[in-house]
Regions:
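Helix-to-loop junctions at the C-terminal end of transmembrane segments
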Residues: 2-13, 97
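Structural signature of the two symmetry-related core transmembrane helices
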Residues: 15-29, 108
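Helix-breaking motifs and short loop linkers at transmembrane-helix boundaries and internal kinks
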Residues: 33-35
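Paired small-residue
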Residues: 38-46
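Pair of pore-lining "gating" transmembrane helices in MFS-fold secondary transporters
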Residues: 45, 140-159
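Cytoplasmic helix-loop-helix junction between adjacent transmembrane helices
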Residues: 45-80
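C-terminal membrane-cytosol helix-exit motif in multi-pass small-molecule transporters
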Residues: 108-128
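Short amphipathic helix-loop junctions that connect adjacent transmembrane helices
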Residues: 162-177
Length: 185
């Protein structure tokens, strides 16, 4: 996350968003070409970093556009749309066999589609003052419980979102049932 502000200050929100959406789109396609657990691990790390960048840019842009009066509503709607999209996206598993390359193309397509509203906007990108960041040590010293809690929540959510489908498959659920279980989570 410390890399993002310096990138934004150099080339702007729109270009950084476009760059990381493109990286995420490319990396998703690479999953269908290279079938290797180690490679997929590396690709997932790259995807995760790209998604952090995309979320940071989108949320900072929304935060800049919202007033103090409507910020909570704007960010609430954003989160509802975000989580609803992720939940409904699970049903795309039913359109193709998971071992085929089509799901990867579909995800890449949606990543590429995310660029259109940002690249075609007439609105100016937000301009933020450069703020000083915190080192991980400073963050831990300021809020040890907060940092540990955030890390544990991140790990547990990642495990749950990543492994619930694997667990459902091991219980011999159909693809529809797996997508429904992941939808509910």
């Amino acid at each position: 996350a410390k890399t993002i502000p310096s990138l934004i200050s150099r080339v702007g929100h729109i270009r950084v968003f476009a760059a990381f959406a493109s990286v995420a789109s490319i990396v998703v396609l690479l999953h269908s070409i290279i079938i290797s657990p180690l490679t997929w691990f590396i690709l997932r790390v790259i995807t995760g970093f790209s998604m952090v960048c995309l979320y940071t840019i989108a949320e900072s842009w929304l935060n800049d556009r919202a007033s103090n009066k409507n910020r909570g509503s704007v960010l609430s709607i954003y989160m509802i749309v975000l989580y609803s999209s992720m939940a409904l996206g699970m049903f795309f598993l039913n359109f193709s066999k998971p071992e085929n390359f089509q799901p990867f193309i579909l995800v890449s397509l949606f990543m590429s589609l995310s660029l259109i509203p940002i690249l075609l906007t007439k609105k100016k990108a937000p301009r933020f003052k450069t703020i000083s960041g915190m080192t991980i040590k400073e963050l831990f010293e300021a809020s040890p419980m907060g940092m540990v809690s955030a890390a544990l929540c991140g790990i547990s959510h990642s495990a749950m979102f990543s492994l619930i489908a694997v667990y459902a498959a091991s219980m011999n659920f159909s693809i529809f049932e797996i997508s429904f279980v992941t939808f509910l989570i």
